[in-house]
Design a protein with these regions (language model features):
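Conserved short histidine dyad/triad with adjacent acidic residue
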Residues: 24-28, 40-55
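Structural motif
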Residues: 68-70, 77, 93, 103
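A short hydrophobic beta-strand segment most commonly corresponding to one strand
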Residues: 87, 102-113
Length: 113
């Protein structure tokens, strides 16, 4: 199985909590993959927050594409800037804050454990 995804045709939408926007480029329900559960982008505006959350059934990787901010994992605050990647085992609370005056764009990947 394979799929071509025209991500430029997929809009960002408000994330239900916090102040981030999310673009869900590929998910199990949209591309039919089995263990790969999500791939997309987060746009966190200046002063915005992608709230802390957990998902014990999935692992996640964040990759900062542009901007800077803080990635929180448990009680650790990680200074995030372009090119930084962070792996999180989903049972650990994690989220992202943008305390700057420029947008922060983060690529995320979820894989089912």
């Amino acid at each position: 199985m394979w799929n071509v995804i025209e991500s430029d045709k997929i809009p960002f939408s408000p994330y239900p909590k916090g102040t981030a926007n999310i673009k869900r480029i590929a998910e199990q329900k949209t591309v039919g993959c089995k263990r790969f559960t999500g791939f997309g982008l987060l746009e966190i505006p200046p002063g915005g927050v992608f709230p802390e959350h957990t998902h014990p059934d999935r692992e996640e990787i964040y990759y900062v594409l542009s901007g800077s901010g803080t990635i929180i994992v448990e009680d650790k605050e990680i200074s995030a800037k372009e090119g930084l990647a962070v792996y999180v085992s989903g049972e650990h609370p994690h989220g992202i804050r943008n305390q700057t005056d420029k947008p922060l764009t983060v690529l995320f990947v979820h894989v089912q454990i």
